[in-house]
A protein has these predicted regions:
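Alpha-helical, hydrophobic structural elements that either
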Residues: 1-154
Length: 154
């Protein structure tokens, strides 16, 4: 029987001039193959006023997680009035604990173009935990992460 395991969605930062520290990483369950788990969890992006952000509408929802074969798809719902997301580049940074405690070379940036975005985490099977070059797709872009992939298994 397959062990249940979790994936951690990395910390979220907004980076117009530099990295703005965000809230803690979010742990999400991994569905069985073919299963969809409805999450509907709101994630607030913490901003520093010194960077010119206000505290309004700086959030998005994780709608659901779907698994197909060994791929995980996370559906994100961005508020249409989310000024920070619309104006800025959203930086997803892989932080300590996932990739050997270093985030160097493990970040990707995209500009949100519409309300919905899809995060594809590709091939997250236990057999690939310590392999390199795990791929993550975000909306219209793809970024190859250089491991080791340190998924938390429970």
């Amino acid at each position: 029987m397959e062990k249940p395991y979790k994936i951690i969605i990395p910390k979220i930062t907004l980076a117009p001039y530099g990295v703005v520290q965000s809230s803690k990483a979010i742990k999400l369950p991994i569905p069985k193959n073919g299963e969809t788990i409805n999450i509907n969890k709101e994630v607030t992006i913490e901003n520093n006023r010194d960077y010119g952000f206000n505290n309004e509408n700086n959030s998005f929802k994780i709608k659901k997680i779907k698994r197909y074969d060994e791929n995980i798809r996370v559906y994100l719902d961005f508020n249409k009035n989310n000024k920070a997301i619309k104006r800025r580049t959203l930086n997803i940074e892989i932080q300590g604990g996932l990739f050997g405690g270093s985030s160097e070379g493990c970040s990707m940036t995209f500009t949100q173009k519409n309300e919905d975005a899809i995060l594809d985490i590709i091939d997250v099977t236990p057999k690939n935990i310590n392999k390199r070059n795990i791929k993550i797709k975000f909306s219209d872009g793809e970024f190859v992460l250089y491991g080791p992939w340190e998924m938390e298994i429970k």
